[in-house]
Amino acid sequence: IHLTPTMGALHAGHLKLVKESKKLKSIVVVSIFVNPTQFGPKEDYKDYPRTLKNDLKVLKKYGADIVFTPIQKQILSHKTKHNCPQFAIEKRLCGKSRPNYFPGVKNIVLKLFDIVQPDAAFFGEKDYQQYLVIKKMTESLKLNTRIICVKTVRDRNGLPLSSRNSYLSGQEFKIAIKINKLLKKLPPLIRTKLKINKILNHTKKVLIDHGVDKIDYLTVLNDDLSVRKKISDKSRIFIAAKIGNTRLIDNIKI
């Protein structure tokens, strides 16, 4: 049994996870649940796109065997025998500005694992920190579920696919494209071992000048999210930025 947990509003990134799951000749389960516990009080829970009818149609076409759409009361009241451990990496990157996010994600994913009992679960590289947190949780609790990370799917402009991209106006979309274009220029600069903080600070300024409203973070870490001592092929660039009311994240390997 292979599980792809989603919040619905499916796009080609989600469907890549389903395709990868399908390749492994398993029972393909996709869950759709907009998890209220991972949203902060001023975040977009109420506005998050809900397109269940279309999602079901698309998943049928892509060969999902089971679509699990629990009602909120059912899943929130489900008890598991485990308590979710906490990890230092939850406090970094998205965890700094979204303190509810990882506790909420872990709580629901653990419940889904308990109900579905998957042999493997699929997560996207775009949400790299989430993938690592879930991987650490399964290892810490000794769950018999392999966590598989699937490469980020991007549109023709390089923008990583996200359900939240639908929030962007035409002008905001043009600004969002510039984030990836600038991000792609950074690895060769960083590999020269010039002053990395100077490069990142300059990039932040350029993004703000191009219309990005806020940079939540732009940083280089090792791929286990530990602080880098030196740049290597295990280093990644991570960014979170706000354009209007829309928060976008991305990461690329150096």
Predicted region positions:
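Nucleotidyltransferase catalytic core that binds NTPs
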Residues: 1-212, 245, 252
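Phosphate/ribose-recognition catalytic cores of enzymes acting on nucleotide-derived substrates
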Residues: 202-254
